[in-house]
Amino acid sequence: KSTLINRIIKHKVSIVSDKAQTTRNRILCIHTDDECQIVFLDTPGIHKPKHKLGEFMDEAAYQSLRDIDVVLFLISGNEKKGPGDLFVLDKLKDVGVPVFLIINKVDLMTKEEILHKITEYAELYPFAQVIPISALKGDNVDAVVDELRKILPEGPKYFPDDMITDQPERLLVAEIVREKLFRCTRDEVPHAIAVYVEEMKDRGHNKVYIRVTVYVERDSQKRIVIGKNGTVLKEVGNLARQEIENLLGSSVYLDIWVKVKRDWRNKSGALSELGYKNE
């Protein structure tokens, strides 16, 4: 989902990972061109939650189904239909708005496989549109915008032309660090990670100091995040700093600390402190 949104917006506003449930917050993203303005809500993936964080993520996704005009239901075309897909489609039965089926990763499929996938899903739900794409390569992504432009109701322009997201800089910085941690760690460790920007200070002369705390649930996870002689954390810091500098247009000193906050994903107070709270 996030790869598609970033491709449409033409900026990186959502972090990307091949791991499930990467997106935790609802992210508002804005596409503006000469003909229209389309507001997208990049939601956490709907799933059966295993902890309070998962419940928060599901609620954020369900809240996004209110006051919308179209749903984009995105699947990986090269993967078999699973119970998760059927679970989400069942939840969409009463949504009351058109649903587009977006078949992603068609660059990895034959024409016959694409046609079979379209037929398979058409039997499950009355989709308003079916659009095969490759979000990574950008193939047919323009068709998504074109079809949305046709079906969306006219309304006022809610945001300035140069605005692409409602996310504050601090949250964007935290998400960049979390994305790099996803890339550099393994197994279940990424899902036990939370990132919080403690301090973000302009020191003048185009230099910004940022202090970030990475929270994990166990001491063993802390050791993995830091790495032998700090190698993992150093790599995360270097990758994140480069992207944050591009985001802010400033030289950045990134100070990353790792702390253990035991079982934070199951504690409402900890979730709220870390910014995971629904409106």
Task: Give each language-model segment a name.
Residues 7, 11, 30-34, 49, ...:
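Conserved, well-folded catalytic cores of nucleic-acid-processing
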Residues 1-59, 63-65:
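Conserved G1/Walker A P-loop phosphate-binding module
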Residues 169-279:
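P-loop NTP-binding site
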Residues 97-98, 107-165, 169:
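Canonical P-loop GTPase G-domain recognition
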Residues 21-24, 54, 58, 65, ...:
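Amphipathic alpha-helical transducer elements in NTP-driven molecular machines
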Residues 20-22, 44-47, 77-81, 106-109, ...:
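Conserved nucleotide-binding/hydrolysis micro-motifs of P-loop NTPases
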Residues 32-37, 56-130, 201-204:
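Conserved C-terminal guanine-recognition region of P-loop GTPase G domains, centered on the G4
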Residues 4, 27, 42, 61, ...:
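Residue-level signature of catalytic and energy-coupling elements of molecular machines
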